[in-house]
């Protein structure tokens, strides 16, 4: 390590947070006031050739340059601010120093094209082909990911080069690792993870960049796994040990405040955080939660499935995951019934006999068979039926149900026409008065129309959403967890009768990627900003990452998800930097509707239960993420623009510690040794945060005649840098108890911090 670089785990480690801020202060980003009359998106220049990094990207580029000892980082940057570009910029500078690189990008297969597009955009033009030839895309989600990974890194042409690993959407990779550790059914992600840990420990030139806007999904220990990848051994390898340290108990709703300081000290140097949600660059967002009562018929079918789930739960609880909250099996029946229940058409086709996929029958045999004999008969017409044949039978049964609904509603529509009633007349009535409440409107008019009543009985939620889409202005995004049956497949029937014809689908059920991309391109076409070609696009969970949409005015989230992060990702698809630049400034706003079905009594539905579980989980994880943000290397540099979602204080060590002759380590190698030591820094029992008044002074240091401006607190004598919140030293008092001064207007800083000894040369920053 260069003499001028400081690491947190050295005997001067407590200087590290101040050292970063002091040496890289020229990258500090200040908040600019919002002027509704200035279109910032039109001011964004499009330079020819490779685009230049923004200050927060250039900071990381220089921080991780070839000469730097800092080799691992989590790029925890917000949606739409250029995380991918940041990692490419880092590679650009590394390549400029040495061309001898392998760049392994671990990413989902569906995001390959997006990465290639970004590489073409952000790689420097000089030696472009050579830069690109160093890059290898690896799908970490494939069934043979570990084998493919080994093949690529062991290829003879790649041996002898320095390795740069970029892990995109690292939260998904870590989730796979966690699953491997706990289930022990597969080790493909774990093998890659362990290889990376070994390499970062054994090879000083290897670098790892992890990218995520949402670094943790399900449980706090995922952060333990992530940071153990970036700095092996800083957290326990077992989840129970990690939780015992950082949670008070298994019911904790926040990080253990007694050990928050320990957590933050151990991750110093591992995170860059940047959010910057500038009003002028992003559409304004409004969130509305809509609770809708079940129809009587829906509640009857829902109760039927709830009884089944209770029976399954008692007899087959072993099939639940340990947490019991995020498995797809948990409340699967009632979860679907919250969206839609099939109407009673005859004794074979009705809400209670909805076909179920074969996996449920197999995983819950002995219970399911007693309850759904018609399913067993349907799926096992031949005892020797192959899996593909069973799947075909199941799909045909589902399609029969869906087509039966459409035929039934067509008969209702025909009956309405005979009575001179049309759904369009109700649509026109609702659109003519924007003060009408949709719930009240539906309840008032549903019995006047057989079609509307039929739609209402099956799903008041989807009926409400359709009226809402038509009433709103501009293009819409619809998100549902389901593609078939209670999801997009049924929504399309509602759309048909509502005459919503200009819609597109973008989900994993559409196998041909070109068709999906054609839909997205058409929706995003600037000429489609008012929905002339497509005014609704429907997406599923598979498309919540790596897909950018433009000119969306309203988002409809049909049901909750176990992870609020998933919902945030959906919203993030439609609100990105300058994603609404083709619209007039007064139309750059997005309304997000979250729909929840409820009973007429107070008993919670699965919609409400999932939302409560997700909210509680999110709130716990958010306390850990808050700690991560506070400990970010660039916290002081970007704090001013990062606090749109609430204020926070950057992690610091006490001023007196930084002026001490014996500075000390920020953390010790062994976490249990660290627990025994006296905690220092923010959130420790010995640390107190105070607001102090400062005023600007001119001063010299005791060994220099150069006069500079500083901020000065007369009560403590502390002197701070004029540009950033960094302690420079202290002005002592003379025998008359007055601050020491060289002349009438110039103070003398006699007790200096060690920062100047570790100042980087200009060429390094």
Q: Where are the regions that the model predicts?
A:
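Helicase-associated low-complexity regulatory tails and linkers flanking the ATPase motor
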Residues: 1-69, 78, 85-211, 215-536, ...
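Residues immediately within or flanking Cys/His clusters that coordinate Zn2+
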Residues: 72
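Hydrophobic anchor at the beta1->P-loop junction of P-loop NTPases
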Residues: 75
């Amino acid at each position: 390590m260069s003499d001028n670089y400081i690491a947190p785990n050295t005997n001067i480690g407590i200087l590290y947070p101040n050292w970063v801020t002091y040496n890289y202060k020229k990258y500090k980003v200040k908040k600019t006031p919002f002027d509704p009359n200035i279109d910032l998106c039109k001011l964004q220049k499009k330079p020819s050739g490779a685009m230049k990094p923004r200050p927060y990207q250039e900071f990381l580029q220089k921080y991780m340059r070839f000469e730097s000892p800092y080799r691992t980082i989590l790029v925890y940057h917000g949606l739409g601010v250029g995380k991918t570009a940041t990692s490419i910029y880092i590679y650009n500078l590394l390549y400029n120093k040495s061309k001898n690189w392998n760049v392994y990008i671990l990413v989902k297969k569906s995001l390959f094209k997006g990465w290639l597009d970004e590489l073409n955009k952000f790689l420097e033009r000089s030696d472009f082909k050579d830069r690109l030839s160093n890059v290898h895309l690896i799908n970490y989600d494939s069934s043979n990911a570990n084998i493919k990974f080994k093949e690529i890194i062991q290829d003879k042409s790649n041996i002898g080069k320095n390795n740069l690993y970029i892990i995109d959407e690292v939260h998904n990779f870590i989730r796979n690792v966690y699953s491997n550790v706990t289930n022990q059914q597969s080790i493909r992600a774990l093998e890659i993870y362990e290889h990376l840990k070994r390499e970062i420990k054994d090879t000083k030139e290897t670098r790892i960049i992890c990218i995520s806007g949402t670094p943790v999904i399900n449980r706090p220990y995922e952060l333990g796994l992530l940071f153990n990848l970036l700095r092996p051994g800083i957290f326990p390898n077992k989840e129970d040990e990690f939780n015992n340290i950082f949670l008070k108990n298994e019911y904790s709703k926040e990080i253990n405040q007694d050990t928050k300081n320990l957590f933050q000290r151990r991750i110093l140097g591992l995170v860059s955080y940047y959010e910057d949600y500038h009003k002028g660059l992003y559409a304004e967002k409004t969130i509305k939660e809509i609770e809708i009562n079940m129809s009587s018929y829906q509640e009857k079918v829902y109760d039927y499935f709830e009884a089944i789930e209770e029976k399954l739960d008692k007899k087959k609880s072993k099939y639940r995951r340990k947490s019991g909250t995020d498995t797809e099996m948990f409340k699967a029946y009632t979860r679907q019934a919250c969206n839609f229940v099939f109407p009673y058409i005859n004794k074979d086709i009705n809400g209670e006999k909805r076909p179920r996929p074969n996996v449920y029958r197999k995983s819950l045999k002995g219970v399911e068979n007693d309850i759904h004999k018609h399913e067993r008969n349907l799926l096992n017409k031949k005892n020797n039926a192959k899996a593909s044949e069973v799947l075909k039978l199941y799909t045909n049964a589902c399609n029969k149900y869906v087509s039966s609904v459409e035929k039934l509603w067509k008969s209702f529509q025909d009956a309405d026409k005979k009575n001179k009633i049309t759904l369009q007349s109700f649509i026109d009535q609702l659109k003519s008065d924007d003060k009408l409440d949709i719930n009240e409107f539906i309840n008032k008019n549903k019995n006047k129309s057989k079609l509307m009543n039929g739609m209402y009985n099956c799903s008041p939620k989807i009926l409400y959403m359709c009226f809402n889409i038509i009433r709103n202005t501009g293009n819409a995004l619809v998100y549902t967890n389901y593609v078939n049956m209670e999801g997009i497949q049924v929504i399309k029937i509602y759309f048909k009768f509502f005459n919503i014809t200009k819609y597109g689908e973008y989900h994993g059920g559409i196998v041909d990627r070109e068709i999906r991309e054609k839909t997205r391109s058409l929706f995003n076409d600037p000429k489609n900003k008012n929905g002339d070609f497509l005014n609704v696009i429907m997406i599923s969970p598979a498309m919540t990452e790596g897909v950018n949409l433009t000119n969306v005015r309203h988002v409809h989230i049909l049901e909750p998800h176990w992870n609020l992060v998933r919902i945030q990702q959906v919203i993030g698809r439609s609100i990105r930097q300058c994603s609404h630049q083709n619209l007039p400034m007064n139309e750059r706003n997005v309304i997000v509707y979250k729909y929840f079905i409820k009973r007429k009594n107070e008993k919670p539905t699965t919609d409400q239960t999932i939302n409560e579980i997700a909210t509680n989980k999110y709130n716990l994880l958010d306390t850990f993420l808050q700690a991560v943000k506070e400990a970010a290397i660039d916290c002081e540099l970007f704090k001013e623009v990062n606090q749109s979602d609430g204020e926070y204080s950057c992690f610091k060590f006490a001023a007196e510690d930084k002026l001490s002759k014996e500075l000390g380590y920020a953390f010790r190698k062994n976490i249990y040794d660290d627990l025994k030591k006296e905690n220092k820094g923010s959130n420790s029992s010995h640390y107190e945060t105070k607001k102090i008044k400062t005023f600007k002074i001119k001063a010299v240091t005791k060994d220099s005649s150069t006069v500079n401006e500083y901020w000065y607190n007369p009560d403590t004598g502390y002197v701070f840098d004029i540009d950033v919140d960094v302690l420079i030293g202290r002005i002592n008092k003379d025998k008359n108890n007055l601050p020491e001064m060289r002349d009438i207007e110039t103070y003398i800083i006699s007790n200096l911090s060690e920062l100047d000894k570790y100042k980087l040369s200009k060429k390094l920053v």
